[in-house]
């Protein structure tokens, strides 16, 4: 068995850190990227990973990461946000920031590692949300951005085949830090879940 190198953005989130743990437990080498230095260091030390402190909203973030790791088998872009507002309170900056976080920076990551992924017959995993396909109140910002991520996924899957696999996961609410305020609201939980259930299942 040969250890593969994987790169995870959004490593301090529940999904990113869980994925990192699974990959490490399977004998792979994992490099984590997070903007919170203390949390990223803590997770890296716990799992035995290398890491880079970088914010995907800042210019030049991809060069900073590539200086630390240049050759990978796969990348998971687990960065996300839950920005819920009624349309009357939404402004252009809200959309721009959300698109930058969820779409534009993901594109930069994929472009930055495209040659390495092609050489290694690698894979890309992106994340959307069930809200991109189902209408939820106050989700205009995030649903629009994640729908764009889904469009990017199918386009790149066709463009990069058969050398690079590109997939997108679109969960409902997950039992994570970012979703904690919504999970505490039972009415919201029932409304945003396909069926009434515990999101940790």
What are these regions (language model features)?
Residues 110, 145:
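Active-site helix of classical SDR
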Residues 115, 157-162:
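Alpha-helical segment proximal to the catalytic Tyr-Lys
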Residues 135-143, 155:
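Active-site loop-to-helix junction immediately N-terminal to the catalytic Tyr of the SDR YXXXK motif
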Residues 191-201:
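Single conserved hydrophobic/aromatic residue that forms the stacking wall/gate
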């Amino acid at each position: 068995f040969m250890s593969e190198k994987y790169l995870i953005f959004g490593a301090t989130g529940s999904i990113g850190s869980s994925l990192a743990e699974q990959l490490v437990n399977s004998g792979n080498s994992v490099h984590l990227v997070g903007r919170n230095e203390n949390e990223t260091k803590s997770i890296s030390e716990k799992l035995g990973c290398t890491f880079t402190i970088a914010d995907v909203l800042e210019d030049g973030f991809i060069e900073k990461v590539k200086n630390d790791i240049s050759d990978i088998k796969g990348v998971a872009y687990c960065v996300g946000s839950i920005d819920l507002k009624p349309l009357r309170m939404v402004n252009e900056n809200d959309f721009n920031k959300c698109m930058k976080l969820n779409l534009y920076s993901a594109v930069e990551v994929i472009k930055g590692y495209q040659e390495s992924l092609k050489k290694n017959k690698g894979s890309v995993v992106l994340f959307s949300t069930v809200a991109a396909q189902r209408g939820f109140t106050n989700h205009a910002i995030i649903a629009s951005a994640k729908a764009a991520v889904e469009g990017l996924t199918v386009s790149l899957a066709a463009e990069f085949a058969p050398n690079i696999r590109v997939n997108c996961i679109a969960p409902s609410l997950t039992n994570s830090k970012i979703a904690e305020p919504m999970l505490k609201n039972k009415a919201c939980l029932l409304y945003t879940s396909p069926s009434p259930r515990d999101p940790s299942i």
